Amino acid sequence: PEFYKFTNKLIPNKFPSLDKDHPRLLIPFRDEEGEVFAYQGRAFGNEQPKYLTIKLQDRDKIFGLDRVTKKEPIYVVEGPLDSLFLDNCIAVGGADFDRPLSIEGSLITNGELTVVFDNEPRNKEICKLIEKTINTGRKVCLWPESMKHKDINDMILGGYTKEEIQEIIKQNTFQTPLAQMRFVTWRKIND
């Protein structure tokens, strides 16, 4: 069914107008017990917005909680589809990692987090978020200059394997103070 119409069945009148309604890929966000607490509709074409996320409960939009092993290192990416290509990975449903990562204590017992932003070195907003994340002391992947794909999904479509991507991430993950030094170089390369 169309996305607005489907959503209105769950949350009456969430979309008062059904104008420009169209089918979308439905991506369920599940909690640790597997219960759906939100879902995201991804446009199949060039429709805007590309993503619409609907919360069914007042929880942070973290995708993959039902699949993550808390005692293992955890990757944190922007998009749910990207998270499906990495082992032990969650997604925050956008580029804003602040709120979801502020509850990381509830996510992790013995593991650690590595934040993997999309590869958008010319996006000033993403650069600010990367710098902010580095300054918190978290591990961050700074994609190599040779990587031309925008995100993990694009890398897969471009012929990279999951194992190759995970190795690239591993080789290009840094933490303070090395992350700060690498970020300065990375930003200059991509200015």
Question: What residue spans do the PLM features occupy?
Answer:
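Short, acidic/turn-prone active-site loops that include or flank metal/cofactor-
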Residues: 94-99, 118-121, 145-147
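Phosphate-handling DNA/RNA-contact segment within nucleic-acid enzymes
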Residues: 1-112, 126-127
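Replication-associated primase and helicase/ATPase modules
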Residues: 1-18, 28-33, 76, 108, ...
